[in-house]
């Protein structure tokens, strides 16, 4: 009977299943109906057959579905396992219609514990086929798994927001019940196709096919445990994030336990697996990588469900998660890892934790917005004139002198502000429709604008606010906005200080336009634009700009950096370099110099000395940096064996002084490039302009020339410094005193000072000479005839005018951009006429300059080199400027070997110091150094050169100068002469001529008697002098008093410095006949001849005066004359 009943039951079930439609089998036959149907027939079957353990266990089949729902709703799985079957049945009736089978399918492809119990309803259908014990055993073993592991995985859900978001898409109809807080596998795919598949799997769960599928699904979790370590997405993450590679690889096996919950396994295996995983998996929990499946990206539309978790299940989970994470730091890391790696792994794990039960910190950093570093771009070249005049346009201009081309930063007005060269761009009217634009001729990323007011001593004009617009075609303009309206930029508060207005976000365009809104005074402004070029430049001249290949330190150097760099160069090339100090500045900073020579520290005979100075004005920084680069270049090239540099170093003693005004540089460097005005840092700390603070020797020389004292009474070279500049209270800067002392110690031949603000070479004279009345008259007549004013222009020229022009052209022609006529002048018109050279007095007349003082006080020919329009260029401009000036700097140094050189000695080969070397046709000589050597720079040609010294006979010879580099050797040997004695005799006679007595001329008896007395007196004086010389003890003679022994000398060399003439003259007399002269003076003051009385001698002299036919000799002259002749 039991077999018949079972057969009838099976037939009934098949009939019911056949009536169910294929599209919705769950709606026709629900689990509750199947449960009631089975219980009804099984109760009858149990009365006839003895109860089995499997049958008893088959009764709580609906419990897994109830647990799954509770886990979705946030309940505790253990409490569901202990719930009575009656309550479970009620819950099954409410929610098992559609969601049970669908969840079961998801559980097959995922590791989430909540979905696993939903596969049990189709397994319940296996019981009529005598396989209910298998179905009953499996759900009983699964509930404890579901209760143990959901507690461990809620923390994973808190760490991975993406996993929680994906699960909510599975059942949108029951979101309040399915809002999971612990999704176990974030990589499950929840597609509509999967939902359909789950329903099909539940329908196929009839008969033995369900057992086959269950068996087929059993090995899947084992394979899935290995898959995370070979995930393709994880491999990509390891390449991008190498720091997290070790942690991510070990944390991937974690999804395996959740997947194994779905399939029934013996409890022994389950207990073994967590033990093995505890050794490896627990430290990997907090950094479990997301599993994206086949690459499908789940949409993030369930953020609210995740970020507002349910409090009941999360509170215990969060605590467990934090405790587990704290324990993970104490667990060992990789095998064989060093202690340093272990500490780094611990910190990496701590950084990636989120102690607030949220997503990992590593993921937050990827998603969070961080401030982007601002792009710092250099100026496009408004101030440096790399932007040409035709690239600057404006809506209007007040007049040509205030046009758009004058709107460059730091543009200076001329002496007359009403001319064509004023100090800003000014609009024609004061309407707000005015603008000024710049065409960069390339696509540029603009980052800011620097504005400045008008340079004027009368007006106070500057722009206070403005708009900025951009365009690519100069037709359609886009205004810069702040997101709501056009952004207003604030400009200047005075006319001199530059103000930077940065753009919050860079803009890429070709044109930039400034629209002034408000201003002070008139609408006038100067500006500079900051931008980085995006596309190559189309300017015809910029295409030829070379790029440096030298490995040098291209950056601005502070005082400490400069000192450190010079120290490094000295250490790299100790055999050819030496660092020393000229003195100190007003603030106590040392003025450093570097000597480069094959024998540093010593002056070699025949080797000329050259100097480069820079930084006289602290804000003119380009020269300072070029000299620092030149130091490095000479050192590197000398070590590399560059023959040109080696010859230059071996034959020349080079002195480089990068900063003569370190105090001024520190002031200018605080503001930085482009932000200091024209005069900031120009003066010293005491307020002096070093270039114009030297003694004025031009006025002294020109006054002597007007009196015809040159070269007899006043020399034309090596003029002494006036006393007013030497007194301690003189208004001379500390730096100038140190420079003068340095110039007098070293016999410099050629030098140049590097400046900024213009692009030209200036040569002396720098002081304008007032023309005389005759010159003015001649100039007026020449102008009336239409001729050039040659006489007036010649008044500003030095005797070495042709040589100075040669030297200036040698630098300007070697410079890459100085002789380009289309560039024009920086501040005003081009005074050089495209040649790059100009006379200082014609261009910018000044008195007391460094160039004029060096030319008149020493042998050094000094020029001023103005390197560029921008005094303080941006750091990015240094490589370009180095290439523009490198060849010119080397070429100018080589000019020191042009001309003649030699040594002046006497007949015994002893060098003669302070000998004068003069060239016929050039009214300017040079002096020999302490070793008797000299250098005279001359243009190619043939010259008659004369060497003369005091006490020696002059010597002259013809010297030829070639075009090639290399001075012609011209040595002189001077013989001693009696001219020194003759000048002494004349001085003793009061510098009056000594008349010669003709013996053939008849004399009166009285004259003869007087002559005899004089002869007797001379004889007696001679005898007395001889006796005194024999009786006198040997020893140094006393020097004569200056009033009696210092005669005026008609030679050029005798009127040198007054403070040096006295000791020099005394020393010369001591070497010759000082004793004799001293004896005579003493005798004159104390005693006279024994046989001749003074009264008689005076009477005789009176008689001679009356007769007018004899000679009248003063008493002193007679005594001196007699003593001198007595020495022969």
Curated annotation (Swiss-Prot):
Annotated spans, Interaction with MAPK1 and MAPK3: 413-616, 998-1128
Tissue specificity statement from the Swiss-Prot or TrEMBL entry: Expressed in aorta.
Listed InterPro entries: CarboxyPept-like_regulatory (IPR008969), FA58C (IPR000421), Galactose-bd-like_sf (IPR008979), Peptidase_M14 (IPR000834), Peptidase_M14_domain (IPR050753)
Biased composition (Low complexity): 1030-1044
Biased composition (Polar residues): 178-187, 198-209
Family: Belongs to the peptidase M14 family.
Notes concerning its domains: The F5/8 type C domain binds to different types of collagen, including collagens I, III, and V.
Protein name per the record: Adipocyte enhancer-binding protein 1
PTM comment text: Phosphorylated by MAPK1 in vitro.
Stretches for region Disordered: 40-368, 1027-1056
Domain F5/8 type C residue range list: 375-532
Pfam family, one: Peptidase_M14
Record's signal peptide: 1-25
Organism from which the protein derives: Rattus norvegicus (Rat)
Residue stretches of biased makeup (Basic residues): 113-163, 249-261
Region described as Interaction with PTEN: spans on this chain: 547-977
């Amino acid at each position: 009977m039991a077999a018949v009943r079972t057969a009838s039951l099976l037939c009934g079930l098949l009939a019911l299943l056949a009536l169910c439609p294929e599209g919705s089998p769950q709606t026709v036959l629900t689990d509750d109906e199947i449960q009631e149907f089975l219980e009804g027939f099984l109760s009858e079957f149990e009365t006839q057959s003895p109860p089995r353990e499997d049958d008893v266990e088959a009764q709580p089949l609906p419990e897994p579905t109830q647990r799954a729902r509770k886990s979705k709703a946030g309940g505790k799985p253990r409490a569901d396992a202990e719930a009575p079957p009656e309550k479970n049945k009620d819950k099954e009736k409410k929610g098992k219609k559609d969601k049970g089978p669908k969840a079961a399918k998801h559980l097959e492809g995922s590791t989430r514990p909540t979905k696993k119990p939903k596969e049990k309803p189709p397994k319940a259908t296996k019981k009529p086929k005598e396989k209910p014990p298998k179905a009953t055993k499996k759900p009983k073993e699964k509930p404890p798994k579901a209760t143990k592991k959901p507690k461990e995985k809620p923390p994973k859900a808190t760490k991975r927001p993406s996993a929680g978001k994906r699960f909510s898409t599975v059942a949108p109809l029951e979101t309040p019940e399915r809002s999971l807080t612990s999704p176990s596998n974030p990589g499950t795919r929840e597609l509509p196709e999967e939902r359909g598949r789950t329903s099909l799997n539940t329908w196929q769960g009839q008969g033995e096919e369900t057992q086959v599928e269950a068996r087929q699904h059993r090995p899947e979790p084992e394979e899935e445990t290995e898959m995370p370590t070979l995930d393709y997405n994880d491999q990509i993450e390891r390449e991008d994030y190498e720091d997290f590679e070790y942690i991510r690889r070990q944390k991937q096996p974690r999804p395996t336990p959740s997947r194994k919950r779905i399939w029934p396994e013996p409890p022994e295996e389950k207990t073994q697996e967590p033990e093995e995983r505890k050794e490896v998996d627990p430290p990997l929990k907090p950094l479990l990588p997301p599993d994206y499946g086949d690459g499908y990206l789940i949409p993030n539309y369930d953020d609210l469900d995740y970020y507002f978790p349910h409090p009941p299940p999360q509170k215990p989970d969060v605590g467990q998660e934090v405790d587990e994470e704290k324990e993970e730091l104490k667990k060992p890391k990789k095998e064989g890892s060093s202690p340093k790696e272990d500490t780094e792994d611990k910190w990496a794990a701590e950084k990636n934790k989120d102690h607030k039960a949220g997503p990992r910190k590593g993921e937050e950093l990827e998603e969070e917005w961080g401030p982007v570093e601002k792009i710092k771009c250099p100026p496009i070249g408004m101030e440096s004139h790399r932007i040409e005049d035709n690239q600057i346009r404006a809506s209007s201009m007040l007049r040509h002198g205030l046009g758009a081309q004058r709107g460059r930063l730091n543009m200076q007005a001329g002496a007359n502000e009403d001319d064509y060269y004023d100090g800003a761009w000014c609009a024609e009217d004061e309407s707000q429709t005015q603008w000024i634009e710049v065409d960069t001729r390339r696509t540029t990323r603009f980052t800011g604008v620097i504005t400045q007011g008008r340079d004027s001593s009368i007006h106070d004009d500057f722009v206070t606010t403005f708009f900025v617009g951009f365009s690519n075609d100069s037709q359609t303009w886009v205004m810069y906005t702040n997101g709501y309206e056009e952004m207003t930029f604030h400009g200047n508060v005075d006319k001199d200080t530059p103000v930077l207005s940065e753009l919050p976000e860079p803009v890429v365009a070709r044109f930039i336009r400034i629209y002034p809104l408000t201003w002070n005074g008139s609408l006038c402004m100067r500006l500079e634009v900051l931008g980085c070029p995006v596309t190559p430049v189309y300017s015809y001249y910029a295409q030829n700009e070379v790029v440096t290949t030298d490995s040098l330190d291209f950056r601005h150097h502070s005082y400490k950096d400069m000192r450190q760099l010079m120290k490094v160069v000295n250490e790299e090339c100790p055999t050819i370099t030496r660092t020393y100090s000229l003195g100190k500045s007003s603030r106590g900073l040392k003025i450093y110099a570097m000597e480069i020579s094959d024998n540093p520290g010593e002056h070699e005979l025949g080797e000329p000395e050259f100097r480069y100075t820079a930084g006289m004005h602290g804000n003119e920084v380009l020269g300072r940096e070029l000299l620092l680069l030149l130091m490095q270049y000479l050192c590197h090239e000398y070590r590399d064996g560059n023959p040109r540099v080696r010859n230059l170093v071996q034959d020349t003693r080079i002195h480089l002084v990068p900063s003569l005004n370190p105090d001024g540089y520190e002031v200018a460097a605080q503001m930085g490039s482009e932000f200091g005005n024209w005069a900031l840092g120009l003066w010293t700390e005491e307020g002096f302009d070093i270039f114009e603070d030297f003694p004025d020797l031009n006025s002294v020389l020109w006054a002597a020339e007007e009196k015809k004292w040159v070269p007899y009474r006043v020399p034309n070279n090596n003029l002494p410094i006036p006393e007013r500049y030497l007194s301690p209270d003189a208004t001379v800067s500390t730096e100038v005193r140190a420079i003068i002392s340095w110039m007098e110690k070293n016999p410099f031949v050629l030098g140049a000072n590097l400046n900024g603000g213009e692009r030209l070479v200036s040569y002396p004279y720098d002081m304008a000479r007032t023309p005389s009345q005759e010159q003015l008259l001649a100039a007026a007549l020449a102008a009336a005839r239409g001729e050039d004013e040659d006489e007036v222009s010649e008044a500003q020229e030095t005797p070495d005018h042709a040589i100075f022009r040669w030297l200036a052209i040698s630098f300007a022609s070697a410079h890459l951009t100085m002789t380009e006529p289309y560039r024009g002048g920086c501040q005003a018109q081009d005074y050089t006429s495209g040649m790059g050279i100009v006379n200082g007095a014609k261009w910018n007349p000044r008195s007391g300059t460094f160039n004029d003082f060096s030319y008149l006080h020493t042998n050094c020919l000094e020029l001023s080199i103005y390197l560029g329009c921008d005094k303080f260029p941006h750091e990015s401009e240094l490589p370009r400027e180095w290439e523009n000036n490198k060849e010119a700097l080397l070429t100018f140094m080589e000019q020191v070997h042009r001309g003649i050189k030699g040594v002046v000695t006497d007949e015994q080969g002893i060098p003669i110091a302070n000998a004068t070397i003069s060239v016929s046709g050039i009214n300017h000589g040079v002096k020999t150094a302490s070793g008797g050597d000299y250098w005279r720079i001359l243009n190619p040609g043939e010259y008659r050169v004369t060497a003369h010294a005091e006490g020696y006979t002059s010597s002259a010879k013809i010297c030829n100068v070639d075009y090639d580099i290399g001075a012609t050797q011209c040595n002189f040997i001077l013989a001693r002469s009696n001219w020194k004695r003759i000048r002494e005799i004349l001085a003793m006679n009061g510098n009056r001529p000594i008349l010669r007595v003709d013996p053939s001329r008849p004399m009166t008896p009285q004259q003869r008697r007087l002559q005899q007395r004089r002869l007797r007196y001379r004889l007696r004086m001679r005898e007395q002098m001889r006796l005194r010389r024999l009786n006198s003890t040997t020893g140094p003679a006393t020097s004569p008093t200056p009033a009696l022994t210092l005669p005026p000398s008609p030679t050029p060399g005798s009127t040198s410095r007054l403070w040096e003439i006295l000791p020099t003259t005394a020393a010369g007399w001591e070497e010759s006949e000082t004793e004799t002269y001293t004896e005579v003076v003493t005798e004159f003051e104390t005693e006279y001849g024994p046989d001749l009385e003074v009264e008689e001698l005076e009477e005789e002299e009176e008689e001679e005066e009356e007769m007018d036919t004899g000679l009248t000799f003063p008493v002193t002259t007679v005594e001196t004359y007699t003593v001198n002749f007595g020495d022969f």
